Structure formats: C-alpha cells, structure tokens
C-alpha cells in the first residue's frame, strides 16, 4: 500500500513539474476597425479604386497566417456595417439573405468582432 501511495505521489510531482515548465507562445493579433462597408477595393460612391478594404486585408492576413498559423488572432472592432452601397444593400434591401459582411468575416476566419456605434444605426 505504501508503494502505491509513493508511486502516485511521484506521478503527481512529475505531472506538476511538467505543467510548471515555461512555454513561450508567440501570438499575432490583427485588428480591423472602422471598415465602414469597404469590403472591396472599390469605392462605389465615387466610382474609384479604394486603397483600404477587407479584400486587401485578407491578402495581408493570409500571409500572416502562413507564419503564425493558429497563433494569429483576427478581430474587428466595429463600425463595419455601413458606409458603402454594398453594406446598405444587405442592411435595407435584401434583409433575408446572409449579410455580405458576415459572409466575408466568416470566410476570412475572424475570431471575434464587436459592434460599433454605426453598426446599430440599421436597427
């Protein structure tokens, strides 16, 4: 009986020492904010190419995911659902289909997103 208690005690000590070993994990956090419906690199209001868009961010995120793999965290900080006709179409015209924004965020594998003040304007 003493031997069993001793073995379990040694196993417990071994398990605790292994758990206490320090492990460094390198994370990459990519955050978007104030996208304002700029899902494509084109401004549908001015009819010109647009420098910022989720499409361009996706290209950047793909490269970063190659290096960081599952250690990349992709977040959005809100104000993404208004600003361009592509967003307004799903906000007011086609309210039954999945919203283009949610489709793009799912495709890009966002880990989380929160609402900004402009995101509640559509109701």
Write out the residue ranges for each language-model feature.
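Sec/Tat signal peptide C-region and signal peptidase I cleavage site
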Residues: 16-20
